[in-house]
Regions:
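Short aromatic-glycine-(Arg/Gly/Cys) micro-motifs in beta-strand/loop hairpins
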Residues: 1-19
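Conserved short hydrophobic patches within well-ordered secondary structure
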Residues: 9, 25-26, 49-50
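Short, charged/polar surface micro-motifs in flexible loops or helix N-caps
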Residues: 14, 29-31, 56-57
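Short acidic, gly/pro-rich beta-turn/loop elements at beta-sheet edges
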Residues: 18, 34, 58-60
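A short, exposed loop/beta-hairpin motif centered on an aromatic-Gly-Thr core
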Residues: 18-27
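A short, charged, amphipathic alpha-helix used as a generic interaction element across diverse proteins
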Residues: 27-44
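Short, mixed-charge low-complexity intrinsically disordered segments
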Residues: 40-72
Length: 72
């Protein structure tokens, strides 16, 4: 079975923004939930989310005036 890459986001307190805290590979969503909770348990997270990396899509235009340029 092919593993799926999931990005992991969490927030420490209600109302705070979600923060990307890492990523993991798992065979399915249920195992990804278990892996995320046990891998990133060093904090007392209020909320943690997983997102399959294949479901993250760029919003900004790739042909815009600053495409391909870093900050600064």
């Amino acid at each position: 079975m092919e593993e799926i890459v999931f990005d992991v986001f969490a927030r420490k307190n209600r109302g705070e923004p979600l923060t990307h805290i890492g990523y993991l590979s798992a065979p399915d969503r249920e195992m990804a939930r278990v892996y995320a909770w046990t891998t990133y348990d060093e904090e007392n997270w209020f909320e943690m989310c997983i997102v399959p990396r294949s479901e993250i899509h760029l919003v900004n235009r790739t042909d815009g005036p600053f495409a391909g340029r870093g900050a600064g």
